[in-house]
């Protein structure tokens, strides 16, 4: 009997690559051959061997016309258009070549990330079944679904008390995915609509969600037409279930380390337990100069040791007026191993943009958060983090609405770090979710069982 073979197509952004690679490793550990399909830009920067893959993961790349990545000033609309047209052809060619390859096992199933919705249509042309790998919380998919299925008027009305079905929390405007806000370009909303229309082309489509049952029990069941399957947290084994101690990274970092980045862990070890404030806003957020200054002021006013990841374009320098003062209190780097940082004993809290990977990692490691959401799913994640899971606090912008003042940043950090009643409750809640995340990934845990059932059904494992 030939080995099962799954093609995994993923958008070439860090937030997509990380969970997709981890999912690929899970498949390989189940003795499934994986073809990992992404752009040349991502492939060039990725580790070609994933930990625990047993040689079962191979990479296929295609040129999207932006082989050096999307650069400042590039046309985003053209980028997505080229990605789609070239990706469709490349995926079709890959599947056709596999059909006639006598040496390789035949691809029998396609999994795709949400900006590659066209991959499902290509799969259908080759009479292959497919599933969406949803890399945000189930709640975000629910909101999009309800928006395009009868609730657009309520959401568009500008209310700060939006009631949706499925047991979702009451939402304010700032809690919505940014693609649904009036300030967002219509093409982003169209991308989400296209994804849902793709799912509608199947009966009871399967959606693999990077979450776990205990975290979103209602959201995972809110859409009757979908079968949402929680398989997360999609985090390297060494940091979660411990089944593979060698699996200590995602294996696909798209960013280069700076010259002073390697000693992060050594520096962390010089600080007391639970004392360090970690600040990182992910791979896509470009923080304004004025906001950088306010973050710096907030950190200095706290007086606590901090590790701050500041991404700059190649050849640029970090320009903050109080840089020398900052260096005396904390450490500024362009890159760090976030998994190593979040699991370090000296870490006290995470000031985060609330991207889902960062949020889920914090939950899985029991790290309380200060939420600093920017766009897409981050406002929703911050809402869930503060009001549903109660593992942190969310900053409020000033009256102009464009900048979060240093005083507000300091206030939020102190709420998490000062050891008072609220701080204690946040840490207790964070510890509870840490335990539940680990239970989901135990041998008989919910996410492990969910994946087993899925694989048994779709590939006959």
UniProtKB/Swiss-Prot annotation:
Chain positions recorded as an anthocyanidin binding sites: 16
Entry's EC annotation: 2.4.1.298
Transmembrane spans: none
Pathway(s) it belongs to: Pigment biosynthesis; anthocyanin biosynthesis
Family matches, as SUPFAM superfamilies: UDP-Glycosyltransferase/glycogen phosphorylase (SSF53756)
Residues binding UDP-alpha-D-glucose: 338, 353, 356-358, 361, 377-378
Family, similarity comment: Belongs to the UDP-glycosyltransferase family.
UniProt protein name: Anthocyanidin 3-O-glucoside 5-O-glucosyltransferase
Record organism: Verbena hybrida (Garden vervain)
């Amino acid at each position: 009997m030939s080995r099962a073979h799954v093609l995994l197509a993923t958008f070439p952004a860090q937030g997509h690559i990380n969970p997709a690679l981890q999912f690929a490793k899970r498949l390989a550990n189940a003795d499934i051959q994986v073809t990992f399909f992404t752009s040349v830009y991502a492939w060039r920067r990725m580790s070609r061997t994933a930990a625990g893959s047993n040689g079962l993961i191979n990479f296929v790349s295609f040129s999207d016309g932006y082989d050096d990545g999307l650069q400042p000033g590039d046309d985003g609309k053209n980028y997505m258009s080229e990605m789609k047209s070239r990706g469709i052809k490349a995926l079709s060619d890959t599947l056709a070549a596999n059909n006639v390859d006598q040496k390789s096992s035949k691809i029998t199933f396609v999994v795709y990330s949400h900006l590659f919705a066209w991959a499902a249509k290509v799969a259908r042309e080759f009479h292959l079944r497919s599933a969406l790998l949803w890399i945000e919380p189930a709640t975000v998919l629910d909101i999009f679904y309800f928006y395009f299925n009868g609730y657009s008027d309520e959401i568009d009305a500008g209310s700060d008390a939006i009631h949706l079905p499925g047991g979702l929390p009451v939402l304010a405007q700032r809690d919505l995915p940014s693609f649904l806000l009036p300030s967002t370009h219509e093409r982003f909303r169209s991308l989400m609509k296209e994804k849902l229309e793709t799912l509608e082309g199947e009966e009871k489509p399967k959606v693999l969600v990077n979450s776990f049952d205990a975290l979103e029990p209602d959201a995972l069941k809110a859409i009757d037409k979908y079968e949402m399957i929680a398989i997360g947290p999609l985090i390297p084994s060494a940091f979660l279930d411990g089944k593979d101690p060698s699996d200590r990274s995602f294996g696909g970092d798209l960013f280069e380390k700076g010259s002073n980045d390697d000693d992060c862990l050594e520096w962390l070890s010089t600080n007391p337990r639970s004392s360090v404030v970690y600040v990182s806003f992910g791979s896509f957020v470009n923080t304004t100069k004025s906001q950088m200054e306010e973050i710096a002021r907030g950190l200095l006013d706290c007086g606590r040791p901090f590790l701050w990841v500041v991404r700059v374009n190649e050849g640029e320098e970090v320009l903050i007026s109080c840089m020398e003062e900052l260096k005396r209190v904390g450490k500024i780097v362009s890159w760090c191993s976030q998994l190593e940082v979040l699991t370090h004993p000296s870490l006290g809290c995470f000031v985060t943009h609330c991207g889902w990977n960062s949020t889920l990692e914090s939950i899985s490691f029991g790290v309380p958060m200060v939420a600093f959401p920017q766009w897409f799913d981050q406002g929703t994640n911050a809402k869930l983090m503060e009001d549903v899971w109660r593992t942190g606090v969310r900053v409020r912008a000033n009256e102009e609405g464009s900048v979060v003042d240093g005083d507000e940043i300091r206030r939020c950090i102190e709420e998490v770090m000062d050891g008072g009643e609220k701080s204690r409750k946040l840490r207790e809640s964070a510890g509870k979710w840490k335990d539940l995340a680990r239970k989901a990934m135990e041998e008989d845990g919910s996410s492990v069982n969910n994946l087993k059932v899925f694989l048994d059904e779709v590939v006959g494992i």
